């Protein structure tokens, strides 16, 4: 009995213990299941996996769900991480963890929420009519290819150069006043014979002929002026000093000819100083917003809709955007424009909703249809140029007293009308006789000029095959055969003012050289560095001018001058009628000191000269032919800055071991009279042609003659170095080449030496050095 009871009791205790152990296991499995389900839910939500709406659609079989991805290639809306999800799109969590069945069977999300592109959507809408396309046409040859793909092997900063199409360069500009003033980059319009500006509005686009009002190479800015047929929409130049690193910005422009292209980024840094293609710039804004060829001159825009920079350059190893772009600060652009125009629009509201602009309408006249309502046939009371505009551009037109209103003539003709001579008399009597004829018609130069395709750039008379001589801007027109009615820039290169040097034409083959690696640090020395201008009405800036093109003293140049590399600055070219020329500086000199301070880089010369007021006599220590001498340079106004000649883009290297040969070289038997050397064809030896209206051109050494380049083969060594047709080669490795015999001897000596070849070149009254 006792034994039996003991067995029963033991068995009972054993069964109870087994049940308790099973409960623990079941509870543990439940907890693990809950954790797994909850983790899966969190993972799907955080990894962008299957969305709740899609999960419910699968479970409930709903076919009419609204929140479905965009189909047929239409991109779905992207939600900015900083934006909150709309309340109607949120889904309540399940009532119990892991209980999928507790979701409601159908959830009505309503219409799909419209997700905007953030605060910049309204900004782009605000500025879409303030950004223009700038086309600069210049004479030249073919675009030079880059067969090796070495566009910029050093990865140095270079200008976001305009898209080059043969001899047309396409950039971007910003309307800064609604009466036709536009800011763009200097390098977009530099050397252009004609400039065209395409302005867009809500209806279409209008192409205007533009006038270059002002240029500043140190700032890389240019001010254009067009005569608008309608009121324009001006952008507001904001305060670039108020922009902080990491602030969001957008870049608007015409990359590769694709107008109104918008890219987004941030302000990556603020650069105190930076050298771009030989020019020292200050306070540039660095951004990662995409800037490409054609973006030059376009706006960099802050979230409040104001322009905080003018896109100008990129840092790239291969010519493509590499995430580093630079913009001229808007404060510099404002001062640059104010020196000429007197006033600019200012914002009256801040923040993303900004849209009101003060001083946008001079003398209180409304913009667009904001003027008072007037009756049809009311004569224009204006005398400031608006009397030539269509009244409907600013006013709403109501019928006259008899209730009848004549049909309005559209500004743009629906069908392109025929081209007409510039002096044609308007045959219209329906009101169009009061309009500007080029609103509808394209002008041709004169009675003998044939029609040209509508909408193409106007070239009334084809320029001669040989480039005409450079002339001064105010030179009198000597023609009487109809060309007196033409724009002189159609055939001639225009020099800005008395003593100004010709603006160098585009690089070899007609392509702008901004896309090539800057081998020399040639710099237009003027101050304040970076182009800080003075506020209008201050009596001008304290800027000083040297008037010389400088380059660092390299090791080979140092050997030639018996100086260690970096001690001094090499003078690569001197502009006539500038302080540098008056002081006696010559190409080939080495500047050792400026105002008693040693200099080692062109930027140091720029910084010292920037401190000097106008009229100050500055002592310059110069090394020439082994002798050190001091020169007194009197600084001049910054208005002469555009006169400085551009140094060649190739590295300047003095060829050693090639002494100057005095006297006349002995005539070598069978001297050729035509030369085909390094891609150059040379047939003629001549004295340089004088530049019309420009005294003080540099005389040619060695008897006054040189070897004229008849043609340059595209892609050749000569083309890559920057030589152009009609250049006059004065010296080859310090040997004068005034005759075929001398050139032949110089070529043979240079070939035998096996070194780089240094050419002294004369172009448009200027001498400079080019290395081959």
UniProtKB/Swiss-Prot annotation:
Its cofactor is heme. It is found in: Magnetosome membrane. This is Magnetosome formation protease MamE. Residues 522-626, 696-765 form the PDZ domain. A motif (MCR 3) lies at residues 470-494. Gene3D superfamilies: 2.30.42.10, 2.30.42.60, 2.40.10.120. Heme 1 binds at residues 391, 394-395. Heme 2 binds at residues 437, 440-441. Residues 1-21 are cytoplasmic. Heme 3 binds at residues 488, 491-492. Probably binds 2-3 heme groups via the 3 magnetochrome (MCR) motifs. GO terms for molecular function: electron transfer activity; heme binding; metal ion binding; serine-type endopeptidase activity. Keywords: Autocatalytic cleavage, Biomineralization, Heme, Hydrolase, Iron, Magnetosome, Membrane, Metal-binding, Protease, Repeat, Transmembrane, Transmembrane helix. It is a single-pass membrane protein. One of its GO terms (cellular component) is magnetosome membrane. It comes from Magnetospirillum gryphiswaldense (strain DSM 6361 / JCM 21280 / NBRC 15271 / MSR-1). The protein isolated from magnetosome membranes has a molecular weight of about 36.3 kDa, probably due to C-terminal cleavage. Subject to autocatalytic cleavage; cleavage also requires MamO; these may be the same event. Residues 43-772 are lumenal. Acts at 2 distinct steps of magnetosome formation; required for correct localization of proteins to the magnetosome while the protease activity is required for maturation of small magnetite crystals into larger, functional ones. Probably cleaves at least itself, MamO and MamP; cleavage requires the putative transprot domain of MamO. Involved in localization of some proteins (at least MamA, MamC, MamF, MamI and MamJ) to the magnetosome. Pfam families: MCR, PDZ, PDZ_6, Trypsin_2. There is a third MCR motif in this protein (470-494) that is not present in the M.magneticum strain AMB-1 MamE ortholog. This bacteria makes up to 60 cubo-octahedral magnetosomes of about 45 nm in diameter which contain membrane-bound crystals of magnetite (Fe(3)O(4)). A motif (MCR 2) lies at residues 420-443. Residues 445-558 form the Cytochrome c domain. One of its GO terms (biological process) is proteolysis. A motif (MCR (magnetochrome) 1) lies at residues 374-397.
